[in-house]
Amino acid sequence: MIQSQINRNIRLDLADAILLSKAKKDLSFAEIADGTGLAEAFVTAALLGQQALPADAARLVGAKLDLDEDAILLLQMIPLRGCIDDRIPTDPTMHRFYEMLQVYGTTLKALVHEKFGDGIISAINFKLDVKKVADPEGGERAVITLDGKYLPTKPF
C-alpha cells in the first residue's frame, strides 16, 4: 500500500544517515543509482528526501548503503517535498540557483509563455541532468538540463 509522510524530519534524518554511509563506503550517487533503472538525479533526490523510490530500487539502494528495513521502507514513502526551510538559501551552491531565478526567473516565465502559452513546466513529469564539460576558455562548466512537460492552464 502506498504510504505518505507528513513530517519532513524523518526523511532529513534518513538523508543524513545515507550521506554518512555513502561517505564511509566512498560511493558516488551514480554508483548508488546504477542498476536501479532510474536516473542518477532522481535517485539522488530520493536519497535526499525529495522523491519516493519503487520497492525494487529502494531494496537495491538499501543493500548498497547497508540500510535497515525501516530505512528501505522510508525510501518508498511519498515525502513532504520541497520542504527546505522557507528562507533564502545560505548554502553557496543553492544560493546561486536562487540568484539565477531572481535574475532570470521573469525571463524564463516570459519565454515559456511566449513559446507555449499560459501554463507551467511540470516538476512531476520531469527529468534533470547535470554534466561537467570543458570550458574552451579554461576550467570547467556545468550544464544543467531541466526537462519538464508543459502543462497548459485550462479555464473552467
UniProtKB/Swiss-Prot annotation:
- Does the UniProt entry include the keyword Mitochondrion? no
Gene Ontology BP annotations: cyanate metabolic process
The active site of this protein is located at: 96, 99, 122
Catalytic activity as recorded in UniProt: cyanate + hydrogencarbonate + 3 H(+) = NH4(+) + 2 CO2
Asked if the keyword Lyase belongs to this entry, the reply reads yes
Return the broad EC class: lyase
SMART domains hit by this protein: Cyanate_lyase
Q: What is its EC number?
A: 4.2.1.104
Among the GO molecular function terms of this UniProt record, one is:
cyanate hydratase activity
Which terms are listed as keywords in the entry? Lyase
Similarity field: Belongs to the cyanase family.
What the protein does comes down to:
Catalyzes the reaction of cyanate with bicarbonate to produce ammonia and carbon dioxide.
Q: What is this protein called?
A: Cyanate hydratase
Q: State the taxonomy lineage.
A: Bacteria, Pseudomonadati, Pseudomonadota, Gammaproteobacteria, Enterobacterales
